[in-house]
């Protein structure tokens, strides 16, 4: 396994570990999720460049679109929770139910 793939896998693993450790705050969970998305984007881009396939060139762009949608929804939820309750705890998400 080349060193670049090992570094990207390590970055994904560290972000996943951070997501599991710091899951009580929404902001830290969103940052760890963005780190995971960034490492997946780099991995998909490198795999696409190595395969030289024209049909696979859309995969990194699709990954970026999903990451942007996830970030927008997460930040909107964070703003809603912090404006309402003043805290960014994940267990406040249960309070948003109707």
Curated annotation (Swiss-Prot):
InterPro entries in the cross-refs: NADH_UbQ_OxRdtase_chain4L/K, NUOK/Mnh_C1-like
Source organism, top-level taxon: Eukaryota
GO molecular function, one term: NADH dehydrogenase (ubiquinone) activity
GO aspect biological process, one term: ATP synthesis coupled electron transport
Catalytic reaction annotation: a ubiquinone + NADH + 5 H(+)(in) = a ubiquinol + NAD(+) + 4 H(+)(out)
One Pfam family it belongs to: Oxidored_q2
Enzyme Commission identifier(s): 7.1.1.2
Any one GO CC term of the record: respiratory chain complex I
Annotated keywords: Electron transport, Membrane, Mitochondrion, Mitochondrion inner membrane, NAD, Respiratory chain, Translocase, Transmembrane, Transmembrane helix, Transport, Ubiquinone
Localisation: Mitochondrion inner membrane
Topology versus the membrane: Multi-pass membrane protein
Chain ranges passing through the membrane: 1-21, 29-49, 58-78
Keyword flag Electron transport: yes
PANTHER family according to UniProt: NADH-UBIQUINONE OXIDOREDUCTASE CHAIN 4L, NADH-UBIQUINONE OXIDOREDUCTASE SUBUNIT ND4L
Assembly and binders: Core subunit of respiratory chain NADH dehydrogenase (Complex I) which is composed of 45 different subunits.
Family according to the record: Belongs to the complex I subunit 4L family.
Function: Core subunit of the mitochondrial membrane respiratory chain NADH dehydrogenase (Complex I) which catalyzes electron transfer from NADH through the respiratory chain, using ubiquinone as an electron acceptor. Part of the enzyme membrane arm which is embedded in the lipid bilayer and involved in proton translocation.
Protein name listed in UniProt: NADH-ubiquinone oxidoreductase chain 4L
Originating organism: Pongo abelii
